[in-house]
Amino acid sequence: NVYWINFGRNIGSEFQDYHYALVIYESKYTALVVPLTSKKDHTPKWIEENKEVIVDIGKIEGYPDDSKECYACTFMIQSVSKKRLDRCGNKKDGYFQIKVTDKQMKMVCDKISEITYNKITKGNIDN
C-alpha cells in the first residue's frame, strides 16, 4: 500500500514533511518505506544522476490525480514509526486507497535487491 507519510524535519536532501511512500514491510510498530516522487518535479539531470537507484513505476492506481506518474526512490528507503502513516483524503471528501500493482512492487523490490547485490559483488562491503 501507499501511504501519506509525515517524514518530519530532516537534514539536507532527505525527504521531509508529507510525501507519499510505498510500504514494503510492516512490523508491529514500524514500517519500511520507499519514498515516491512525482516525475514532473524532476529535471532530466536529476533523473540521469539517479537512474541506477530510482524506479519509474508510472501511474499508481487510486491517486487523486490519475495523471500523476511516479518514481520510487529506492536509495532513500527508511524505517518509520507506523504513527507516521496517514490515510489519503479527509473526513469531508472521504479517504481513498492507493495501491501499486504486483508488477510495480516487484520492480521496486528487484531494484533494492540489485542495489544490495551490486554493493556486495563489487567488494564495497568491509569485512
PLM region descriptions:
Residues Y3, D17-H19, C70:
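Short beta-strand or tight-loop elements
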Residues S13-E61:
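Compact nucleic-acid interaction/catalytic patches
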Residues R9, P35-T37, Q78:
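A mature extracytoplasmic/lumenal domain signature
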Residues N1-R9:
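Short coil-to-beta transition motif at edge beta-strands of beta-rich domains
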